[in-house]
Amino acid sequence: MPTYSPKAGDVTRQWYVIDATDVVLGRLAVQAANLLRGKNKPTYAPHVDGGDFVIIINAEKVAISGNKRQDKLIHHHSGHPGGLKSRTVGQVLETRPERLVEKAVKGMIPKNKLGNAIAGKLKVYAGPNHPHAAQQPVPFEIKQVAQ
């Protein structure tokens, strides 16, 4: 009997919703990245997009451990000379909390075409509401919360 190799058409996808309230950002990102890649499934293969859809709600209430809220800087560049912009994690969390969570999760998936397809299945919302009720997402609980 030959070894089973999953194909793109063999995948059945499920929708998960994760509440980010009082969950440490890194632990949230690890769990979300594993669900997106399909590492929780017995048919996991690194060359196939076999993961599930992940909805993260309450991104504004995510926990940041240590002094990272005021000490850690997030950089981006406009592309023009002298166009390096820097903001602290706390500033980003106040203005666009969904971007902070997206950046943390996308940093844990591959940086290639497959990674872009995987990142497309991530939906992040700052508040408790999301427009994906028709997909009947299953709640996914992260047991380790911040003290």
UniProtKB/Swiss-Prot annotation:
Lineage, top-rank taxon, reads: Bacteria
> Per its UniProt record, what Gene3D superfamilies does this chain match?
Ribosomal protein L13 (3.90.1180.10)
For this chain, one GO molecular function annotation is:
structural constituent of ribosome
GO cellular component terms?
Answer: cytosolic large ribosomal subunit
Q: Which cysteines share a disulfide bond?
A: none
The subunit field of the Swiss-Prot or TrEMBL record says:
Part of the 50S ribosomal subunit.
> By what name is this protein known?
Large ribosomal subunit protein uL13
Gene, per the UniProt record: rplM
